[in-house]
């Protein structure tokens, strides 16, 4: 199952992704994103934890204004 990095403040997103069977990695620092297939961030900081510095080869999804279910759909789309 793909590894999904989720910013630690997005607990509802973490729970929703776990319920769908994904391995969820809480993102607290730059190194947490390494090895993740996709990362979900709050978008409060455009360059949160240096993720935009290509720490991860996976997609980065900004959660701003989206529900947990909408984010799960975006994750599934990115992983196809």
From Swiss-Prot:
Signal peptide range in chain numbering: none
Protein's name in the database: UPF0180 protein GWCH70_0946
Organism in which the protein naturally occurs: Geobacillus sp. (strain WCH70)
Family, as annotated: Belongs to the UPF0180 family.
Source lineage: Bacteria, Bacillati, Bacillota, Bacilli, Bacillales
Database matches in Pfam families: UPF0180
């Amino acid at each position: 199952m793909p590894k999904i990095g989720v910013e630690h403040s997005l607990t509802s997103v973490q729970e929703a992704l776990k319920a769908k069977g994904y391995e969820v990695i809480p993102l607290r620092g730059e190194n947490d994103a390494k090895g993740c297939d996709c990362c979900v961030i709050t978008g409060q900081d455009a360059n949160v934890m240096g993720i935009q510095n290509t720490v991860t080869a996976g997609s980065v999804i900004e959660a701003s204004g989206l529900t947990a279910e909408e984010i799960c759909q975006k994750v599934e789309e990115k992983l196809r």
